[in-house]
C-alpha cells in the first residue's frame, strides 16, 4: 500500500509519517518484489481536496500490475476520470455513503467489478470524512446496502488499529465476511506473517499491508507464500 501526499509516500492521518520521495519508484519496487496488486490512496485529495492526479498517472505508466485507487473522490465526474485511466478498481468512500446513487451510476457504466466501496470502521460503526464523522450503521449493514446499489467489492478498514502496528482484531472481519456476499479486502493493523496467515484463512479476497512493509515488520515475499492457501 502507498499513501500519496505532497508527491511523497506517507503514512495514515494521525499516525507517524514515513516520507519517501518518488511514489512511482516505490510502486515499481513493490511490483519487482512480486506484488500482484497495488493499493494507492491519494491523501492530497483526502486531506487537502487537491488531487495528485499527475503522480497517479506516473505510477500507472511505471507499473503493469492492477491498481486499486482511492482518496479525495468527491464527484462522479472525477470518479469517471480516474476509471478512464484503466485502474482496476476505484475505491469510493464518503461520496458513496452520502450519495449511494453514484455507486449505481458508476457500476452501470463501468461494471460493478471496478467499483469498491470503502467502509472504515471504529467501534463497529462506519466513519467518513477522513474518520472525523461517525454514522449510526455497522459495516455489515452498509455492505448489504451497497451490494444492492451495485458495488462489486468491499475495502474494510479497522480504524481502531490502522497504522499502529499493533495487530488486528479477528471478530470484525469474520462478522463482515459472514454478513455479505461480496469480495472483501481487509486493511488495518496487519503486523506479522501470523496476521497474514490468519486473514488468509478467514476467506478475505485480499489484504492491504502498508506500515508493516515500510518498517520491515513483514517481508513481502514471505507474505505472498500464504496467498490463496
Enumerate the language-model features and the residues they cover.
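Structural preference for beta-strand elements that scaffold enzyme active sites
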Residues: 37, 64-68, 88-91, 114-118, ...
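Catalytic cores of alpha/beta
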Residues: 67-86, 173-206
Amino acid at each position: 500500500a502507498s499513501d500519496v501526499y505532497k508527491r511523497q509516500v506517507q503514512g495514515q492521518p494521525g499516525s507517524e509519517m514515513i516520507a519517501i520521495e518518488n511514489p512511482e519508484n516505490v510502486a515499481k519496487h513493490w511490483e519487482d518484489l512480486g506484488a500482484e496488486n497495488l493499493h494507492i490512496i491519494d491523501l492530497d485529495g483526502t486531506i487537502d481536496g487537491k488531487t495528485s492526479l499527475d503522480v497517479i498517472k506516473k505510477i500507472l505508466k511505471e507499473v503493469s500490475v492492477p491498481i486499486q485507487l482511492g482518496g479525495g473522490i468527491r464527484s462522479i465526474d472525477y470518479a469517471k476520470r480516474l476509471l478512464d485511466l484503466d485502474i482496476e478498481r476505484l475505491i469510493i468512500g464518503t461520496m458513496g455513503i452520502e450519495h449511494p446513487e453514484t455507486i449505481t451510476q458508476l457500476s452501470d457504466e463501468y461494471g460493478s467489478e471496478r467499483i469498491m466501496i470503502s467502509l472504515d470502521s471504529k467501534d463497529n460503526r462506519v466513519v467518513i470524512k477522513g474518520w472525523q464523522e461517525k454514522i449510526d450503521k455497522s459495516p455489515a449493514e452498509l455492505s448489504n446496502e451497497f451490494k444492492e446499489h451495485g458495488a462489486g467489492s468491499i475495502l474494510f478498514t479497522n480504524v481502531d488499529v490502522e497504522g499502529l502496528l499493533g495487530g488486528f482484531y479477528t471478530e470484525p472481519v469474520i462478522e463482515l465476511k459472514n454478513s455479505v456476499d461480496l469480495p472483501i479486502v481487509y486493511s488495518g493493523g496487519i503486523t506479522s506473517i501470523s496476521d497474514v496467515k490468519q486473514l488468509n484463512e478467514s476467506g478475505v479476497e485480499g489484504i492491504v499491508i502498508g506500515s508493516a512493509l515500510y518498517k520491515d515488520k513483514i517481508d513481502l515475499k514471505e507474505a505472498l507464500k500464504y496467498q490463496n492457501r
